[in-house]
Regions:
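A short alpha-helix capping/helix-coil boundary motif
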Residues: 11, 64, 74-76, 96-97, ...
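A generic structural motif
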Residues: 32, 50-51, 191
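Conserved small-residue-rich beta-alpha loop and adjacent elements
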Residues: 135-206
Length: 215
C-alpha cells in the first residue's frame, strides 16, 4: 500500500476546544457542544455550549482574581498588557489564518484587524499609568480641608464583543477595563469560533491576561 493511499485513509483528528475560566481551560458544565464550521460550511470542531453555571463560575473566578490585579501598580499592569501586544504581534499570521477561515468577509481585513488589535493593546498599555492623572482632580472647596477625585476599580466587568470585528472588539473592551484594575468576563461567539481553527492563538493570551497572584 502506497504512502499516499495510507495518508488519504486517515481519520481527521479535530481539536476539541475548552472554555477559558480563571486562568485554565475547562470543559463546560453541561458537557454539550455545537459544531463550528468554516466559511465553506466544513466542520472544524465541536465548541462547548456553556450554561448559566459556567457564566457564574466565570464571574466568581474574575471576582476572586480582582483584588490581586487591582493591587498591582499601574505601571505593572501596563507591562502585562504590552506583553500581550508583543505576543499577539509575534503570532499575527496564525491569528490572520484563524480569522480568514471562518468568514469570507475577513479575507482582506483580517491582517488589518490583527494589526489594529496590537496597536490598541499598546495604546492602553501606555494609558495604564496616565489615566489617573487625567481623570483625577483636586476639587476647590471653600473650607479648611482638601477634596480629591480619584479613580477606583469597579470590579467585574461583563463585555460582549461585536461579531463584525471579533478580535478587535473583544480586545478593545477588555483592555479598557483591565487597564484600570478591573477584571473581565468576555463573550465573543465569532472569536471563539475562529480560535478553534488555530490552537496556538487561543492559548497565548492566557498567561499575560491572567491576573497572577502577587508574590
Amino acid at each position: 500500500m502506497s504512502g499516499d493511499r495510507m495518508t488519504s485513509m486517515r481519520i481527521p483528528v479535530t481539536k476539541t476546544p475548552k472554555v477559558y475560566v480563571g486562568g485554565a481551560f475547562i470543559r463546560s458544565e453541561s458537557g454539550r457542544t455545537f459544531p463550528a464550521r468554516d466559511a465553506n460550511g466544513e466542520f472544524v470542531a465541536n465548541v462547548p455550549q456553556c450554561t448559566r453555571k459556567d457564566l457564574r463560575n466565570a464571574v466568581e473566578a474574575a471576582a476572586k482574581a480582582g483584588p490581586s490585579w487591582a493591587a498591582r501598580t499601574p505601571y505593572n499592569r501596563g507591562q502585562i498588557i504590552y506583553r500581550l501586544a508583543e505576543m499577539l504581534e509575534s503570532r499575527a499570521d496564525e491569528m490572520n489564518a484563524a480569522l480568514r477561515q471562518f468568514s469570507r468577509d475577513w479575507t482582506d481585513g483580517a491582517e488589518q484587524e490583527v494589526a489594529l488589535t496590537v496597536d490598541r493593546l499598546v495604546h492602553y498599555a501606555g494609558w495604564a499609568d496616565k489615566y489617573e492623572q487625567v481623570l483625577g482632580n483636586a476639587n476647590p472647596v471653600a473650607a479648611p480641608f482638601f477634596n480629591f477625585t480619584i479613580t477606583e476599580p469597579m470590579g467585574v466587568i461583563g463585555t460582549i464583543a461585536s461579531d463584525a470585528f471579533p478580535l478587535l472588539g473583544l480586545v478593545s473592551q477588555a483592555a479598557a477595563a483591565i487597564v484600570s484594575g478591573n477584571t473581565v468576563v468576555a463573550l465573543s461567539f465569532s472569536l471563539a469560533r475562529s480560535l478553534v481553527g488555530s490552537a496556538a492563538p487561543a492559548r497565548y493570551p492566557s498567561r499575560p491576561c491572567r491576573p497572577p497572584s502577587r508574590p
